[in-house]
Amino acid sequence: NPLESIVFITLPEDFQISKAAMHIDTTIPLPVQLPLGTDKDAKFDIKTLSEEMILAGILTVLAYDKGNSNLNYYRSIISKAKPNIKKELTEAAILKARNEDFDIAEEIFDALRGLDPEDMGTVLNTALFFDQRADSYRKSGLLEDADAYDNDAEFYYKQAMESEPVIPDAFFNAGFFYLKQKNFSKGKECFEIYLAYVIDIK
């Protein structure tokens, strides 16, 4: 469980460096990613705290602790500290997926959806990722895993196709997905909707 490497700390009022740079509210516990091999039960030394540990902690919480009551605050911290974070993470996730480093790619997509749950571009990218992962596992003969990832892909394709405003590419990619599933009627329906939107846009 990735959350096991996280500790929540409350910064002292006189903590200035990161507080000034990252707009820290010292009344709200801050998630911190502990370095590998650190004893979680040992008292945390505030002098070892870095911006990277805070950002990594926040991303982990965004990815795996969807019920945390401070998510909006954590999102605001990371967005102010790293204005281009979504672009950077998206590029990293796509690169990891392309290199078939699937577990890391999935973690990054989880963090991206936690960072901005309303971003349907991220939802569509997640669908494409699971689609690719299913194809890779199927080619390797891991059919049960492939079927599970197909289910994940369909879940996110459906979300992307319900997006407002409409994302035509969601229907285009879902069409190919359903063709691979041999669900030809659903694939045809997706392509027809895609064409209707594209022609209308032109």
Short names for language-model regions:
Residues 43-47, 72-90, 202:
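TPR-adjacent "capping" and linker segments in tetratricopeptide-repeat scaffold/adaptor proteins
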Residues 111-112, 159-160, 193-194:
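Canonical positions in the second alpha-helix
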Residues 121-122, 170:
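TPR alpha-solenoid repeat register
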Residues 83, 117, 164-165, 199:
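Short coil turns that delineate tetratricopeptide repeat
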